[in-house]
Swiss-Prot record:
<keyword id="KW-0238">DNA-binding</keyword>
<keyword id="KW-0539">Nucleus</keyword>
<keyword id="KW-0347">Helicase</keyword>
<dbReference type="InterPro" id="IPR038718">
    <property type="entry name" value="SNF2-like_sf"/>
</dbReference>
<feature type="region of interest" description="Required for chromatin remodeling, strand pairing activities and coupling of ATPase activity">
    <location>
        <begin position="2"/>
        <end position="9"/>
    </location>
</feature>
<dbReference type="GO" id="GO:0005634">
    <property type="term" value="C:nucleus"/>
</dbReference>
<feature type="binding site">
    <location>
        <begin position="188"/>
        <end position="195"/>
    </location>
    <ligand>
        <name>ATP</name>
    </ligand>
</feature>
<dbReference type="GO" id="GO:0043150">
    <property type="term" value="P:DNA synthesis involved in double-strand break repair via homologous recombination"/>
</dbReference>
<dbReference type="GO" id="GO:0048477">
    <property type="term" value="P:oogenesis"/>
</dbReference>
<dbReference type="InterPro" id="IPR001650">
    <property type="entry name" value="Helicase_C-like"/>
</dbReference>
<dbReference type="GO" id="GO:0045003">
    <property type="term" value="P:double-strand break repair via synthesis-dependent strand annealing"/>
</dbReference>
<dbReference type="GO" id="GO:0015616">
    <property type="term" value="F:DNA translocase activity"/>
</dbReference>
<dbReference type="GO" id="GO:0004386">
    <property type="term" value="F:helicase activity"/>
</dbReference>
<dbReference type="InterPro" id="IPR000330">
    <property type="entry name" value="SNF2_N"/>
</dbReference>
<comment type="subunit">
    <text>Interacts (via N-terminus) with spn-A/Rad51.</text>
</comment>
<keyword id="KW-0498">Mitosis</keyword>
<feature type="short sequence motif" description="DEGH box">
    <location>
        <begin position="300"/>
        <end position="303"/>
    </location>
</feature>
């Protein structure tokens, strides 16, 4: 008997259990029969719905439906029927071929085609195949037809005309199109885009060739350690991530060996086909890298290979590759033996052996340069020079940075002669008159002794600031026995006093004016880290933001420091740079003013350092200031630099740049000093355009800052200076005695990189290539500049 009229809970439970799924094999027999009857009823309802919509019977359809629909989803069933129709190829009488009529692994004959369109606008074609007739094409094997080699439009659209010529020149050299050799020397001056040209060459050779396949499978770029990261950035920048490079920076020895072995052993396609490595790392692991063949090697800052006896040169010579490219932004400025080493590296035996070269060229050329040489010896020297130029001109290309005047803002260069302060003057004269200098001259027979070289360095430090020789004064070293009384009583060596140095006083005034005038940034360069310490003290005293790069900074940190300084939003006002550590390859376009605080014996080093700001990407007018102490040894160094650049060629230079080769007469001139003259350099020029140190005739309009100093503007006062900052500092500091200045071009002409494409089209049509700066023969006595007799 039921206790309540409510539904029975047992009925609810049975209903729930009946609706739950149970595998058919586990169901009882009578339950399976009931579900079968239920399905039959459902099928009958679905048939009625199909007849209603005019659909085919799903059970008799040629294509079964992927899912089963209930009576309530007839509309969905209609849509599914449309989607499930069999696809029919829209070609009459089409018979499908499932591969039964051909063998596996047989490749169809494919007609070779160039990777890029040679007829496209602004296309740079490096290889032009023969013009085949139609009859020849029909009889030739389509798989053996040569195709065009066309530079990727990604690069050809941004290459400037001189860069297009450079890429074509290097390609023809490494592919043996110019002769029986496969190497070349890219000797363009700084800022002309040697890196971009090499990136273009590497990318082209890795991707294509006349036979419609890559010419090389891997390449190695060897550079100074400070530039390895820069090369990686350049590849990423120009190729936009299309090529991954293997940059060897740091890491354990075991990991380095493993990575280099994997790179060397792999002969097929590599994920990172370009190895970026420093000279030092290559020398250490040369045994691994020289085991297997490499498609091409590029040596940046190649003047490091001027000595064929060093270990790095010999290690690179052991590399198994015939394609060698050497980059050097500075011309060869020393002896012919160094020049032979560079040419012999890229093209072995082009000039024969070292003994053959000396016998055939070097002896005759050097003999003709002697002051007591005969007319016949001079004539033979010129003939041998021209013969040598004819040989090496096939594999050397050099363009000057005058090309940049089309694309960059105007640049002003100024050589500023600064008077010594009273303290500097007394220290300088005391040292020159000391027994130390007399003994140095007496001990010097044919070449400078080590003592004389140390004395030269001491004089250079006095010209910069007395702080640099303070310890010598306190210790009463030779030459400074009587100099303690020269320093003032309130002298504190750890606190910078700009007023005790003429150059520091001028620098202090100019930095303050630049800081107050606007948002210009400044690069300060010196050959001595001690001078950088003084720069740092001055910056802290004036509360200038600064960064410093010298030899103690790691490679990874250098790139971060450069990026920070170049950031327009950065608070860094000064970039302090050691010319020995970072004078090559750095891009400091965040600044537009540069101070070269002390000169180097080698003009190439100064040129490299001063080219850091006037480069691609610079938007402001640039000002380059070279500071030298008037009448001192610094002016003598400047004169030797000027003499070297004006009378030397890229092949022949009998006047060597190193101070280790000064004779006694040279040292007597270096240790001379006249404190009354405004500029010893201007006096020795015997300038005919100036009367009593006042310029009466301007230089020719065709001259620029690459011309000889005698063809620059000469100023003995601040009138006519191109820089208002310097003009004001001249008045305020009262320590400037003379200024030489000139500009890079007559007027400011800036072209965007995009405009290079239009100019390139006209260049391609010209039959004459861009004029290259070719080495000149040795100058005879009567061919020298008349205004330069004193140097």
């Amino acid at each position: 008997m039921r206790r309540s009229l409510a539904p029975s809970q047992r009925i609810g439970q049975s209903t729930a259990s009946r609706n739950a799924f149970t595998p058919p094999l586990l169901q009882k027999k009578n339950k399976r029969a009931c579900q079968k009857d239920l399905r039959l009823d459902t099928d009958a309802d679905e048939d009625k719905e199909r007849k209603r919509f005019g659909l085919r019977d799903a059970t008799n359809s040629e294509i079964p439906l992927p899912i089963r629909f209930t009576a309530n989803s007839a509309y969905e069933l209609a849509i599914a029927q449309v989607l499930a129709r069999k696809f029919k190829v829209p070609i009459d009488n089409y018979v499908p071929d499932y591969g039964g009529n051909r063998c596996l692994g047989v490749r169809r004959v494919v007609v070779r085609r160039p990777l890029h369109d040679p007829q496209a606008c602004n296309a740079l074609v490096l290889f032009q195949p023969p013009n085949y007739t139609e009859h020849e094409r029909m009889s030739m094997d389509p798989s053996k037809v040569l195709v065009h080699v066309v530079v990727d439009p990604l690069l050809s659209n941004i290459l400037r005309p001189h860069q297009r010529e450079g890429v074509r020149f290097m390609y023809e050299c490494v592919e043996g199109k110019k002769g029986d050799f496969n190497g070349c020397i890219m000797a363009d001056e700084m800022g002309l885009g040697k890196t971009l040209q090499c990136v273009t060459l590497v990318w082209t050779l890795l991707r294509q060739g006349p036979e419609s396949k890559p010419t090389i499978n891997k390449a190695i770029v060897v550079s100074p350690s400070s530039l390895v990261k820069n090369w990686e950035k350049e590849f990423t920048k120009w190729l936009q991530g299309r090529l991954l490079c293997l940059a060897m920076e740091g890491g354990t020895k075991e990991n380095t060996i493993r990575v280099l072995e994997q790179f060397s052993m792999t002969s097929s396609k590599l994920g990172t086909p370009v190895l970026l490595i420093s000279y030092e790392t290559f020398r250490i692991y040369a045994e691994i890298l020289c085991k297997y063949e490499v498609g091409m090697v590029i040596c940046d800052e190649g003047h490091r290979l001027k000595n064929s006896d060093n270990l790095t040169y010999q290690a690179l010579m052991g590399l198994k590759t015939k394609r060698r490219v050497l980059l050097s932004g500075t011309p060869i400025q020393n002896d012919l033996t160094e020049y032979f080493s560079l040419v012999n590296f890229v093209n072995p035996e082009m000039l024969g052996t070292a003994a053959d070269f000396k016998r055939n060229f070097e002896n005759s050329i050097l003999r003709g340069q002697n002051a007591d040489s005969t007319e016949g010896e001079r004539k033979k020297a010129i003939e041998k020079t021209q013969e040598l130029i004819g040989l090496v001109d096939q594999c050397i290309i050099r363009r000057t940075n005058q090309i940049l005047t089309k694309y960059l803002p105007i640049k002003f260069e100024m050589v500023i002669c600064v008077k010594l302060t009273a303290i500097q003057l007394q220290l300088y004269t005391n040292f020159l008159n000391s027994d130390q200098v007399r003994r140095s001259l007496a001990d010097c027979n044919e070449k400078a002794s080590l003592t004389a070289l140390a004395d030269i360095t001491t004089l250079k430090k006095i010209c910069s600031h007395p702080d640099l020789i303070h310890q010598k004064i306190e210790a009463k070293e030779k030459g400074f026995e009587n100099s303690q009384n020269v320093l003032p009583s309130n002298y504190k060596p750890k606190e910078i006093c700009p007023e005790w140095s003429g150059k520091f006083m001028l620098l202090d005034f100019m930095l303050a004016a630049i800081r107050a005038a606007g948002n210009d940034k400044v690069v300060l360069i010196s050959n001595y880290t001690q001078t950088l310490d003084l720069f740092e003290q001055l910056a802290r005293k004036r509360k200038y933001g600064f960064v410093r790069l010298d030899g103690t900074m790691s490679i990874k940190k250098r790139s971060k420091v450069v990026d920070k300084f170049n950031d327009p939003d950065s608070e860094c006002f000064l970039f302090m740079l050691s010319s020995k550590a970072g004078g090559c390859g750095l891009n400091l376009i965040g600044a537009n003013r540069l101070f070269m605080f002390d000169p180097d014996w080698n003009p190439a080093n100064d040129e490299q350092a001063m080219a850091r700001v006037w480069r691609d990407g610079q938007k402001k007018p640039c000002y380059i200031y070279r500071l030298v102490a008037s009448g001192t040894i610094e002016e003598k160094i400047l004169q030797r630099q000027t003499h070297k650049k004006s009378l030397s060629s890229t092949i022949i230079d009998n006047n060597e740049s190193s101070e280790k080769h000064f004779t006694r007469d040279d040292l007597k001139d270096l240790f001379s000093f006249d404190q009354k003259i405004l500029s010893d350099t201007h006096e020795k020029l015997k300038c005919k355009r100036c009367v009593q140190n006042i310029q009466t005739k301007p230089p020719s309009e065709s001259t620029d800052c690459t011309s000889h100093l005698s063809q620059w503007y000469h100023c003995s006062n601040n009138r006519g200076l191109p820089d208002s900052i310097l003009a004001q500092a001249w008045t305020d500091s009262k320590c400037v005695s003379f200024v030489f200045h000139h500009r890079s071009q007559a007027k400011e002409v800036v072209e965007s990189p995009e405009s290079a494409a239009a100019e390139a089209e006209s260049v391609e049509e010209e039959s004459q290539p861009t004029q290259r700066k070719r080495p000149s023969p040795p100058l005879s006595d009567d061919s020298a500049d008349e205004d330069f007799i004193g140097f």
